[in-house]
Amino acid sequence: MTSLLFDFSAPQSVTLWNPINDGVMGGISKSQLRYDPAGHAVFTGKVSFENNGGFASVRCQPGDLGRKDVTAYLLEVFGDGKRYKLNLRTDNSFDGVNYQVQFHPTAGTWTTCRLARADFLPSWRGKPVPDAPPLDTSRVRQIGLMIADRQEGAFELAIRLIAVETV
């Protein structure tokens, strides 16, 4: 069964998403999640390595995004050839453990990326957290998109929806 978390077909769909870029560490990368009148959102910006930077992200405001028995997260996206991460947080805090998985959508075409629950790994500021508990999808409070991993320059990921697949 599939359950929709975010449908980006309307302008108000992006209002709960905020940029969190490497400026928190002195960097100058920029990003935003904006609405495209074609009926989807666009995660766009520029990653810069200046001032020890190197990542850009957007995150939704905390809310009840938890679902039981999740087997995968589904993203319908139009890629630009770059690698991205989906971040999940199980609390309302700004900083702390993130459960993340990388995805590499096909460039130039709409595709559905299926991100298996088992592939989400706990990390803190990009470093593994081996002693963190496994992801409990029923406790998810925040969802985010990120670009990092030494990918300098402009980026643009169009996104129609984020959903969950459950048993």
Predicted regions and their residues:
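Beta-rich carbohydrate-recognition modules and glycan-binding surfaces
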Residues: 1-167
